[in-house]
Amino acid sequence: MGTWDTSLYGGDLPLDIKDEYYEQLYEGHTPEEAAALVWKELRLGEEDLPVFRLILADVQWKLGQMTEDTLRNALEVLDNGAAMAEWEGASESDRRSRQRVLDRLRKKLESPQGPLKTVKRPKPKKFKYKIGDVISVQLVPELVKGKPEIEIYCNKYFMVQA
């Protein structure tokens, strides 16, 4: 698992939690069931609890589903310093940036959430090619500058079958 920026969803774990939560809602589970299943499916541990509580609160708030327990748990993480614990070794500017993110999250969570939103599984995008279609792709020099092992194939066409 990695973290690439200070945003609330700037890491693998927050995105996994959000995606799995939506997946459980798509399957027809209640918000409470979905939260429990996320914890189980992702095999989360105590060290993941602060991130889990913050992401769960954010997603539920956006969907109009946030319960008092979810809010209380998220505010506890924000109040007791657990939300910043994983940022102890980060640079001062990253810690300040993350704290601003958490401050905005607190403000949002303490504001009234919107109406309950219906969550539907997105329809898959239609692929414009049919199975068996052949696609021709030209390798252009701009994409392979400085890679001599690939430059020899520039301006040639590759055929791909769908």
Language model: regions and residue ranges:
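Short terminal alpha-helical segments
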Residues: 1-39
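Amphipathic alpha-helical elements of HEAT/ARM-like alpha-solenoid repeat scaffolds that form extended
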Residues: 2, 16-17, 48-62, 95-103
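Mixed-charge, low-complexity intrinsically disordered regions
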Residues: 6, 58-62, 112, 120-121
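Charge-rich, solvent-exposed alpha-helical interaction surfaces
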Residues: 20, 24, 34-38, 70-77, ...
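Charged interaction/catalytic cores of defense and host-pathogen modules
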Residues: 36-92
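Mixed-charge, Lys/Arg-rich low-complexity intrinsically disordered regions
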Residues: 93-131
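Short coil-to-beta transition motif at edge beta-strands of beta-rich domains
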Residues: 125-145
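Short beta-strand-centered aromatic/proline hotspots
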Residues: 144-161
